[in-house]
């Protein structure tokens, strides 16, 4: 009889980040500003890459997809978060929660593998310069971009299916600001041990596999750089890798902290603050990192500005 009286959950409610009005106002303004910069920066990067023939190289082909993924991952979280900040009830439907989890997980997973593809591209450019055009042909580049999307689909579909096959019949309040898998599993009526193991194993496998590709690539790059005789040559080689290393360090450090460490190490409130960083801030940082520290991107931007203000023939 008790089982029949249990209420099946049809929607979820978020606790959000704060209940204080002034903090809500500051949070809304900050997130809105960061989101607009994210959209403008990443869309501008994509437009610049596709409009400038000098940037039609494998490195910028990958970077355009990274910008697309960053823009989409932020858009799967930020608009809903902005709407919820001043809402009395921060609600989301059962299927809406599943969709948000799937799309965000898909784009974040894709980004991890894209960064690995970009590391391999840097390896071939520095360690195998004479074979670069052969090793990084158009066909290879397409495979190195399609692969991350496919692996990410398999990964997040597994997590989302396992999570939403669990019964939710008790509390429907998620201690978070979006449908993340870990706080959602804590609401399940059934034992979610299998889900947590799968989450730990798959997240760890993605991190280890893509991380190993990045580490091996950069160890080989460093060994090659140390063999370069001229200081200018070394500086040029380092400059081509510094932006990518910065992006890798920020994203992987944050994701490992959230998903791979033991779940009891830190409170959900700390997790929420760190999640805010990687859901909203990191997508904004990548175009800034790659544009401010890349001479070719800055050169392409200057050419566009000069062409607009000083068109030929005037």
From Swiss-Prot:
The keyword Membrane applies. It comes from Mus musculus. Pfam families: 7tm_4 (PF13853). It is a multi-pass membrane protein. GO terms for molecular function: G protein-coupled receptor activity; olfactory receptor activity. The gene is Or5g29. It is found in: Cell membrane. This is Olfactory receptor 5G29. Potential odorant receptor.
